[in-house]
């Protein structure tokens, strides 16, 4: 059998074969590759070879199974383009367990009633092509920086549990309007729902909301009452850093939800960036330290 690869996104050969023959085990696929029962472009191929559009897979009668016909799904051009960027322009790190990307601001992590394009919708396209990507945490649409994506179910469980047990160390850079009273400190509060998609600070002993904890450190004084602050959230509540910055009296520049528009200078962007993530060896079997480059508008404000 001759199969012309039709995926524009490069994928591992074993994953591509698994999509064509769902009933086959990984062991059977690898044995077929070792015995040259499956070749790519007339060459012996390893399981981790990435096949792409234009490649040709030759399969002997070894499998003796019909190729599975998948339901045809239609994806928007924007989703396909974003999928390619996730694996190229945005990609910071990749191993067998996960990929890490530098998400730009204005791009949603997940879709919604008014959101047609998101990281999640692009992952659905990649998964349709044979991948098994899964989101394990999220960033606000307006927040840029590091976003981890699991490459399979088992890794997604490990990473999700690590976030839940507060084993993932995250650091954010923010430019704020105003400064906190203390240069270094910790913020503790409850965060509960408010009107619409807004959240609010509630009393620490209140039944409304969940406990939120953030460490912070003032890093640099900038011009026009602007300051660079490092935030390290212990918990991961919705809009936590934005609300805690507001509570400290120094809202994040460009935050149109929790900033004071009448006082704070106008900004097209919100200056909150997920800069660092640290995973200990106990999470995925090795220590991982990641850093995401600041966007151009952020570095421009720092000079």
Swiss-Prot record:
Entry-linked PROSITE patterns: PSI_RLU (PS01129), S4 (PS50889)
Species of provenance = Rickettsia typhi (strain ATCC VR-144 / Wilmington)
A single GO BP term for this record reads:
enzyme-directed rRNA pseudouridine synthesis
Q: Where is the active site?
A: 140
Report the gene name: rluC
Task: Give the EC number(s) under which this enzyme is classified.
Answer: 5.4.99.24
Query: What is the official name of this protein in its record?
Result: Ribosomal large subunit pseudouridine synthase C
Role according to the record = Responsible for synthesis of pseudouridine from uracil at positions 955, 2504 and 2580 in 23S ribosomal RNA.
Family membership noted in the UniProt record: Belongs to the pseudouridine synthase RluA family.
Q: CDD domains this protein is in?
A: PseudoU_synth_RluA_like, S4
User: Which terms are listed as keywords in the entry?
Assistant: Isomerase, RNA-binding, rRNA processing
Q: What reaction does this catalyse?
A: uridine(955/2504/2580) in 23S rRNA = pseudouridine(955/2504/2580) in 23S rRNA
Alphabetized Pfam families for the sequence? PseudoU_synth_2, S4
List the molecular function annotations (GO) for this entry. 23S rRNA pseudouridine(955/2504/2580) synthase activity; RNA binding
All residue ranges annotated as the S4 RNA-binding domain in the record: 11-70
Q: Does the keyword RNA-binding apply?
A: yes
């Amino acid at each position: 059998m001759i199969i012309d690869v039709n995926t524009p996104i490069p994928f591992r050969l074993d994953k591509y074969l698994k999509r064509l023959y769902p009933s086959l085990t990984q062991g059977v696929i690898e044995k077929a590759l070792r015995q040259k029962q499956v070749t790519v472009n007339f060459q012996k191929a390893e399981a981790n070879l990435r096949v792409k559009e234009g490649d040709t897979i030759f399969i002997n009668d070894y499998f003796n199974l019909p190729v599975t016909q998948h339901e045809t799904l239609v994806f928007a051009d924007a989703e396909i383009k974003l999928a390619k960027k996730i694996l190229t322009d945005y990609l910071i790190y990749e191993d067998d367990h996960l990929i890490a990307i530098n998400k730009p601001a204005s791009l949603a992590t997940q879709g919604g009633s008014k959101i047609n394009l998101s990281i999640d919708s692009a992952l659905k396209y990649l998964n349709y092509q044979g991948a098994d990507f899964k989101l394990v945490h999220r960033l606000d649409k307006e927040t840029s920086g590091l976003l981890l994506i699991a490459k399979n179910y088992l890794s997604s469980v490990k990473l999700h549990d690590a976030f839940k047990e507060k084993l993932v160390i995250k650091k954010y850079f923010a430019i704020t309007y105003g400064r906190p009273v203390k240069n270094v400190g910790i913020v503790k509060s409850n965060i509960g729902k408010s009107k619409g998609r807004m959240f609010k600070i509630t009393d620490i002993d209140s039944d409304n909301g969940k406990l939120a904890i953030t460490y912070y450190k003032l890093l640099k004084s900038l011009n026009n009452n602007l300051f660079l602050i490092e935030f390290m959230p212990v918990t991961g509540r919705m809009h936590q850093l934005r609300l805690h910055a507001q509570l400290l009296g120094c809202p994040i520049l460009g935050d149109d939800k929790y900033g004071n528009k009448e006082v704070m200078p106008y900004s097209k962007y919100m200056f909150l960036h997920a800069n660092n993530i640290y995973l200990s060896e106990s999470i995925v079997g090795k220590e991982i330290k990641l850093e995401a480059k600041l966007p151009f508008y952020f570095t421009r404000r720092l000079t």
